Amino acid sequence: MSESLRIIFAGTPDFAARHLDALLSSGHNVVGVFTQPDRPAGRGKKLMPSPVKVLAEEKALPVFQPVSLRPQENQQLVADLQADVMVVVAYGLILPKAVLEMPRLGCINVHGSLLPRWRGAAPIQRSLWAGDAETGVTIMQMDVGLDTGDMLYKLSCPITAEDTSGTLYDKLAELGPQGLITTLKQLADGTAKPEVQDETLVTYAEKLSKEEARIDWSLSAAQLERCIRAFNPWPMSWLEIEGQPVKVWKASVIDTATNAAPGTILEANKQGIQVATGDGILNLLSLQPAGKKAMSAQDLLNSRREWFVPGNRLV
């Protein structure tokens, strides 16, 4: 068996917690866990711990929640743990150069794309949005840049026509721990083969916004259908009707040309709500008016047919 490593884990959401769980079953020694401070959540704005903190406390691991790792005293928390390696998964804080250099084997990161494609904050969503045929995870050696470090290990998976960001997130949350455990074994054995990223292939996965998720009917039906899957479950594609936001959960592309202006309602029936776009027709299948649950287009038409009169335009 490979050497058992002393590991600091740094992460915050459920995606990170799944990696911590795998580490705890791997035979390595997790000596400390860093996660973001508790945040207000829910209607009562009660302070809630991160999924990583919940798991770490269940396992009686030391938990640290600094607001920043820039202050010297917070960097000392890392140094005192005398780790071989620091594993970073969706932590949300910048690691200064001094911290990156503290562990014997440095810091490694699990990133939700096949680098150098989709560096940045929203790689899962952007891969769907762009119509990529595949994605995956990259385990990389961290440096001071944004996802610029040498690649240590990659695992890929296909993107299907049904995938949403939610389903892709789950797939990568399965792949990531596999890649992480393999990489740690290679680091412990001295067999890791770092690969420099090709800067000519870099793309950036910019952070999502609710405004970006508003449906722009001038785009093609194919692009809009991908957006709807990419922005599900957050921030959710939406349109506005009579001043109310209506979320769109599912749609399909009807590959028929139309001369109607983008946003024009062409048909509204049990097959869906067909709307002209910049190229082709988008068929809305599942929608969610404000304050309601998601429902089929047919159910929405039963209660709000006046919203979808053929010939009218959605803006």
From Swiss-Prot:
- The keyword DNA repair belongs to this UniProt entry's keyword annotation: no
Known catalytic reactions = L-methionyl-tRNA(fMet) + (6R)-10-formyltetrahydrofolate = N-formyl-L-methionyl-tRNA(fMet) + (6S)-5,6,7,8-tetrahydrofolate + H(+)
A GO molecular function held by the record: methionyl-tRNA formyltransferase activity
The organism sits in which domain of life? Bacteria
Which residues hold (6S)-5,6,7,8-tetrahydrofolate?
A: 113-116
What are the GO cellular component annotations? cytosol
| Keywords noted in UniProt | Protein biosynthesis, Transferase
Its Enzyme Commission number(s) read: 2.1.2.9
- Can the keyword Protein biosynthesis be found in this entry's annotation? yes
NCBIfam families linked: fmt
Q: Report the family membership.
A: Belongs to the Fmt family.
Sum up the protein's function in the record's words: Attaches a formyl group to the free amino group of methionyl-tRNA(fMet). The formyl group appears to play a dual role in the initiator identity of N-formylmethionyl-tRNA by promoting its recognition by IF2 and preventing the misappropriation of this tRNA by the elongation apparatus.
Instruction: State what protein this is by name.
Output: Methionyl-tRNA formyltransferase
Annotated source species: Escherichia coli O17:K52:H18 (strain UMN026 / ExPEC)
What gene is behind this protein? Answer: fmt
